[in-house]
């Protein structure tokens, strides 16, 4: 049985005090939820201030990106060791906004995934097609390329902790949502690619999250599908009540 993951990507929102206020609001609302793994991903500057606030809440801490070198002359970058030091246990890698605005490629995703795993962080590896790719009928081709490129060179044992997030780029921050059927079709395909890469057992165990305008009113339908194991939530994770409602989707 795959334990669902609900991860909140705060993107470029929330100062230290705003983040602490959000955790203060969120923590009691998700208290006692043991059936779901809860993760929040603040900006780098906020990471070190949250572990104390999250203690005893069952909420894990993720970074929104990582660099593949441990240290060196890489201005502006943060290494896996430094993220661990700041209290993170997870890291989002290859988010569509990183690909769109900052030149992220399959090659850099692959380096980051390997570095994160070596540094004992759980990678949340994001893949997804643009509207152009979907309309051209290239969804599966894009997903397979991104998956194989991002996970290249990993053994089945190394892959085991990895979480995959499917985020159709056309549904991020647009208010458009992939239908439950569209999302399930993509997730089933992703699981099939993983089976080809690492075997059926690995594919059966990997958690595949859906990301793309997830809200309290659509999460239940998405989570009812057999290959959807959670959500990577953007805007709706910035308010305690809406994020808690998503976390408690099964109630």
Curated annotation (Swiss-Prot):
Its EC number is 5.3.1.1. It catalyses: D-glyceraldehyde 3-phosphate = dihydroxyacetone phosphate. One of its GO terms (molecular function) is triose-phosphate isomerase activity. Pathway: Carbohydrate biosynthesis; gluconeogenesis; Carbohydrate degradation; glycolysis; D-glyceraldehyde 3-phosphate from glycerone phosphate: step 1/1. GO terms for cellular component: cytosol. Gene3D superfamilies: Aldolase class I. It is found in: Cytoplasm. Substrate binds at residues 9-11, 173, 213, 234-235. Belongs to the triosephosphate isomerase family. This is Triosephosphate isomerase. It comes from Citrifermentans bemidjiense (strain ATCC BAA-1014 / DSM 16622 / JCM 12645 / Bem) (Geobacter bemidjiensis).
